[in-house]
Amino acid sequence: THTRSSAASDVYKRQVQDVSTKNYKYIPQLTMAGYSIMIKEISKQTNHYITHIFVQAGVGGLAAGVVAGVAKYFKRIPKIVVVEPDRADCVLQSIKANKLKKIRIKKESIMGGMSCNEMSLVPWQILKKSSDYCVSVADNNVAKTTAMLKDRKFSKGSIIAGECATPGVIALIGLANNLKVRKLLNLKEDSNILVIGCEGNADVKLYKQLLSKGRK
């Protein structure tokens, strides 16, 4: 974030990032608190018990903010499924290793905001204890999922979902089509599933390309 003072001669820049490190935690914690407001709003908009939440992860801030919101605002705790690109699965690899794991990204994911090679410190402290499952999804499902969400046949209204808003839906469809995994997660016809989407068509050019490709 760049800040410009009122005096033209007094110009300075300040970078605000949501990635926490050993000596930089306060701002990322505020960012995560902001993410948790989504959960507060959702808890007020439905009386249904949400059984599962699918939430995407880059460095883990959004996912950890959702978990914190669930703990604060939900009366019953759903299963939490964290989803990330298979080209940048730093959360999955960290949880498997039971320690922060820095991975090597051989090729960047099309889900650019989630193409991260290392988790943020504060989210790690939350997700290592509170996420039920971690899964990774492939880039080749992004375009058709973007197009599917845009199609009014899929929902009551057209859903404008950019590349980073698709992972939860991709994971849900994939897991639901696997009988063994479906039983493991206790996914049923009467499950109430919350899928978090984190962006619209932020990159208009890329969004149009994904729609075109996904509709073929």
Give the ranges of each region predicted by the language model.
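Single conserved hydrophobic/aromatic residue that forms the stacking wall/gate
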Residues: 1-8, 12
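Short, glycine-/Ser/Thr-/acidic-enriched flexible segments
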Residues: 21, 141-142, 166, 200-202
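Glycine-rich phosphate/pyrophosphate-binding loop at beta-loop-alpha junctions
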Residues: 22-129, 182-216
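Active-site-adjacent helical/loop segments in soluble small-molecule enzymes
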Residues: 38, 119-188
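A structural micro-motif
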Residues: 13-14, 78, 132, 158
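Conserved Rossmann-fold dehydrogenase catalytic segment
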Residues: 17-26, 140-145
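The feature captures the short pre-catalytic strand/loop hairpin that immediately precedes
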Residues: 18, 101-108, 146-151
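Structural signal for conserved beta-strand scaffold positions within catalytic alpha/beta enzyme cores
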Residues: 15-18, 82, 136
